[in-house]
């Protein structure tokens, strides 16, 4: 049996992080967590691209453009969508989630969903490092693992195909 999986070695990986300015109290902490995770695991500053955008909906356009560039090993999208009194929360949360899923099905570059969807600001802050760990850090770990998995899948599938299996 062959088991293929990624690891947490970030050396040489190029990672983009897309982060909105909206809800900056939360998203800045998510970004800090993501950058901490990437750097702790060997991703160098020169291989990290941070793209600041106005809000979470703008991530869809930005992700498409980053995918078109085809220079990153993985892309992290961060954000904080906090429920309010209108339907806007549902629209934003659903559309960004659907877009990330669609891009992951149709592109070769893994996109990691690090967008918080919470009922309250307190819940968002807790998930951005106050109590429940930092989801930005967790997204960085997933990005490194998936970037390495992508490389291994390419290598192992290519080697298998080359050997006639």
From Swiss-Prot:
Which Pfam family, just one, is annotated for this protein?
A: DMRL_synthase
Instruction: List the record's Gene Ontology CC terms alphabetically.
Output: cytosol; riboflavin synthase complex
SUPFAM superfamilies, alphabetized:
Lumazine synthase
Q: Quote the record's binding site residues for (2S)-2-hydroxy-3-oxobutyl phosphate.
A: 85-86, 127
Q: Where is the active site?
A: 88 (proton donor)
What's the EC number here?
2.5.1.78
Q: Which residues make up the binding site for 5-amino-6-(D-ribitylamino)uracil?
A: 22, 56-58, 80-82, 113
* Top-level taxon in the UniProt lineage: Bacteria
Pathway(s) the chain acts in:
Cofactor biosynthesis; riboflavin biosynthesis; riboflavin from 2-hydroxy-3-oxobutyl phosphate and 5-amino-6-(D-ribitylamino)uracil: step 1/2
What InterPro entries does UniProt report for this protein, alphabetically? LS (IPR034964), LS/RS (IPR002180), LS/RS_sf (IPR036467)
Q: What class of enzyme is it?
A: transferase
Q: What does this protein do?
A: Catalyzes the formation of 6,7-dimethyl-8-ribityllumazine by condensation of 5-amino-6-(D-ribitylamino)uracil with 3,4-dihydroxy-2-butanone 4-phosphate. This is the penultimate step in the biosynthesis of riboflavin.
* HAMAP family assigned: Lumazine_synth
What family is this? Answer: Belongs to the DMRL synthase family.
| Protein's recorded name | 6,7-dimethyl-8-ribityllumazine synthase
